[in-house]
Curated annotation (Swiss-Prot):
It is a multi-pass membrane protein. The keyword Transport applies. InterPro entries: Brnchd-chn_aa_trnsp_AzlC (IPR004471), Brnchd-chn_aa_trnsp_permease (IPR011606). It comes from Helicobacter pylori (strain J99 / ATCC 700824) (Campylobacter pylori J99). It is found in: Cell membrane. It comes from the Bacteria. This is Uncharacterized membrane protein jhp_1251. It holds the Pfam family AzlC.
Length: 228
């Protein structure tokens, strides 16, 4: 228990920026869900067991449109397909996490993945406990935001337009932090180039998954050149 608390204290400061973003986005989700007539229990269930910001927002539209189960499954797979790339890249780090593995896989959101690759535990801190703490903290922030938003949204009406930019801003900050920490910027510029080309060719609706697949392939094929 002492080792876990040590890792928890080490992980917490790294998650503060995510707390601010997840609080706002979680509240937005909860408010939108409440406006569709669903109470806090639905928000809690979705944030506990689905825990995927994009698909949770899409689910609100699907629920209001009374979409079929098959449509829900297909849309969920398409929206969250990028998580496969994240999971594959974390296989080595997760392989010795034992009973924590199912939760670490479940909680591997975009932001958690970014933090796990940006920060390392301090000397003497168990890496598995550190990764678990970051995942647990981020998940808790999302649940808290969703519950607050749901409870507030059931009593008041808010204009949530533009709130989605919060997470984009967080990603930019995390990218800049990683860019400053590393002297080799080849990976960063390669990722930017692939993303820009895919955006130009495939548009905003399809570029993300294609860009991620191409980035993974490029990192595998040109690993030695990029590490020089």
């Amino acid at each position: 228990m002492h080792d876990f608390l040590k890792a928890f204290k080490d992980a917490f400061p790294h998650t503060i920026s995510i707390f601010l973003g997840y609080l706002l986005m979680g509240m937005t989700f909860g408010m939108l869900l409440a406006q569709q007539g669903y109470d806090y229990k639905v928000a809690l269930f979705m944030s506990l067991f689905i825990y995927a910001g994009a698909i949770q927002f899409v689910a609100i539209t699907l629920l209001s449109a009374q979409a079929s189960l098959m449509n829900v499954v297909i849309v969920s797979l398409l929206v969250n397909a990028r998580q496969t790339c994240y999971a594959l890249s974390m296989l080595d780090r997760f392989k010795n996490t034992k009973w924590r593995l199912p939760y670490l896989a479940h909680a591997l959101t975009d932001e958690t993945f970014a933090l796990l690759n940006l920060y390392a535990p301090k000397k003497g801190v168990n890496e598995t406990d550190f990764m678990f703490s970051i995942s647990l903290l981020n998940h808790s922030y999302w649940i808290f935001g969703s519950l607050v938003g749901s409870l507030v949204g059931s009593h008041f009406s808010f204009d949530t337009q533009g709130m989605e930019f919060v997470m984009t801003a967080i990603f930019i900050v995390l990218f800049m932090e990683q860019y400053k920490r590393n002297t080799n910027h080849k990976n960063a510029w390669l990722g930017i180039a692939i993303a820009v080309v895919c955006l130009a060719l495939f548009g905003t609706e399809y570029f993300l998954l294609i860009a991620l697949v191409l980035m993974v392939l490029a990192l595998i094929l040109f690993r030695k050149q990029l590490e020089c």
